[in-house]
Amino acid sequence: SAGANIYMLGQSEHTWKVNFCKFTNETRNGFEDSSDSGSIKFIAAVNGICAGGGYEVALACDEILLIDDRSSTVSLPEVPLLGVLPGTGGVTRLIDKRKVRKDLADIFCTNADGVRGKKAVDWKLVDYIAPPSKFNDLIDERVSKVSSTVKLRDGKEGIKLKSLNRNITNEGIQYDTV
C-alpha cells in the first residue's frame, strides 16, 4: 500500500481525519493484540511500493516479506515530503519492535525513496526477500511456518481456508473466488 492519500486528507473535514486516524490506529493495534495473544498471526507480503501508513500496517504484522524486483520498496516518507514525523507509531515500531538501529531509522525516515531488497533485510525493515519467480513460494513457506505457532483455544481446530486458484494473463491476475 502506498499509504493514505495526503492531498485527499488535506481537503477532508477535521472530524473525518480524526476518525480515519483512529480507525487505522485501531487496526494496527488490533493486529498486534491478536498476535500477542497467539490467536491470529499476520504476514505482510509487499509487492510494489509500501509507504507511509501502508508500511505502518506492515510494521504491525508478525513478518514482512518483500518481493526483490529492484523496484519494490518500503518507506516512511513523511519527514522529507511533509515535514512531519510518521504520526501513528511507525518510528516506535521500527526501533522498539523491529530493533532497527537508531541511526539507520534516522536515515530511513529522511529518505523519501525508501529501501529495497537486501538492504531492507540488512536494516531489519523487512524479514525476507525473494525474486519474483520465488515470491509466492516464500509466501506459502512463511504462512505454513507462522501458522504453526498459532495457539488454538480449548484444543479447537482453526478455520482452514482453501487456496485461491490464481490465473495470471497478459491482462492481469484473476481468481476463481474472492
Model segments located where?
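Glycine-rich phosphate-binding loop at the start of an alpha helix
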Residues: 21, 52, 114
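Short beta->alpha connector loops at strand-helix junctions that form conserved
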Residues: 46-47, 67-70, 131-133
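CoA-thioester-processing core
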Residues: 51-108, 139-142
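Intrinsically disordered, low-complexity segments enriched in small/flexible residues
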Residues: 97-116, 121-123, 127-178
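Hydrophobic/aromatic residues within transmembrane alpha-helices
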Residues: 5, 57-58, 120
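Glycine- (often His-adjacent) and acidic-residue-rich active-site loop
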Residues: 1-29, 80-83
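Short, well-ordered beta-strand core segments
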Residues: 42, 64-65, 129
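A short, small-residue-rich loop immediately preceding and capping a beta-strand
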Residues: 34-50
